[in-house]
């Protein structure tokens, strides 16, 4: 089992490096096309991107089983919302990897009759559902942390009789701001933004997870035709997300838990 864990970790690191290189090629290809580079060079970059994509699919063989194991562990979480979001996310990831394995079989020639377009659309749908669950989980954790921070700030204000740390009352769980009108609404919004910034600054793993999932969201949206972003945006978002994923491998404390 230890040997499998080490092998899986190595495969995961290689897959993320390949992913970063793939989206870097996508971004580079878009830049070359925009600046009128030679067709031969553009073709070579596209071929390299395709080879990296196929290599990633090979490295992801068996990831469905890992995702199912993660879903089984998430079922035992005590928080109902986290249990639902994380379990559904892992189940969709398992289905995404299963579709990806079928695609690999088709692209590698093992199953030449596979309808690659149909399976690609299926895989991106499952990928999109997984990301939606991840972002829902992030939003839930942010809300909980904002409520905790607001309550702590209110307690400090009652003890000191003044404004502490630049965050005034009025956040979730706070005493609120009397009155109405546009100035009060703008002030409440400003306080919420400051509170959000403080929460994210104090929880780097959550901040990285939000940015990574938000960047990844553009990929299935573009591939499914729900929001055409273009290869440049997809390449940039994929590259940023890949770098953040590699960072969580290098610094495990930056990985959001559970």
From Swiss-Prot:
Keywords linked to the UniProt accession: Acetylation, Membrane, Peroxisome, Peroxisome biogenesis, Transmembrane, Transmembrane helix
Q: Which residues carry this modification: N6-acetyllysine?
A: 43
| Bilayer topology | Single-pass membrane protein
Listed under GO cellular component are:
peroxisomal membrane
Question: Does the record's keyword annotation contain Acetylation?
Answer: yes
| UniProt-listed Pfam families | PEX11
Which BP terms from GO are recorded? peroxisome fission
**Which stretches of sequence are listed as region Interaction with PEX19, PEX11G and FIS1 and peroxisome targeting?**
210-258
This protein's assembly is summarised as: Homodimer. Heterodimer with PEX11G. Interacts with PEX19. Interacts with FIS1.
- Indicate what this protein is called per its UniProt record: Peroxisomal membrane protein 11B
Q: What organism is the protein native to?
A: Bos taurus
Q: Which gene codes for it?
A: PEX11B
């Amino acid at each position: 089992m230890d040997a499998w864990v080490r092998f899986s970790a190595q495969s995961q690191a290689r897959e993320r490096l390949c992913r970063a290189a793939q989206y870097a090629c996508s971004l580079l290809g878009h830049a070359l096309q925009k600046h009128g580079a030679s067709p031969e060079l553009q073709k070579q970059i596209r071929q390299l991107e395709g080879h990296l994509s196929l290599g990633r699919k090979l490295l992801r063989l068996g990831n469905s089983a890992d995702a199912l194991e993660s879903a089984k562990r998430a079922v035992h979480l005590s928080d109902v919302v986290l249990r639902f979001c994380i379990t559904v996310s892992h189940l969709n990831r398992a289905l995404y990897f299963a579709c990806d394995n079928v695609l690999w079989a088709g692209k590698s020639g093992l199953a030449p009759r596979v309808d690659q377009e149909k399976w690609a659309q299926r895989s991106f749908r499952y990928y999109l559902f997984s990301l939606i669950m991840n972002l829902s989980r992030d939003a839930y954790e942010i809300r909980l942390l904002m409520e905790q921070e607001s309550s702590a700030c209110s307690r400090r204000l009652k003890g000191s009789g003044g404004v502490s740390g630049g965050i005034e009352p009025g956040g979730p769980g706070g005493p609120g701001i009397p009155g109405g009108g546009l100035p009060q609404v703008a002030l409440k919004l400003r306080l919420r933004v400051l509170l959000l910034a403080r929460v994210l600054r104090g929880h780097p793993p959550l901040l990285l997870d939000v940015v990574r999932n938000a960047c990844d969201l553009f990929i299935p949206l573009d591939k499914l035709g729900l929001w055409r972003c273009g290869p440049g945006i997809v390449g940039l978002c994929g590259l940023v997300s890949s770098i953040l994923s590699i960072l969580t491998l290098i610094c495990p404390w930056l990985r959001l838990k559970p």
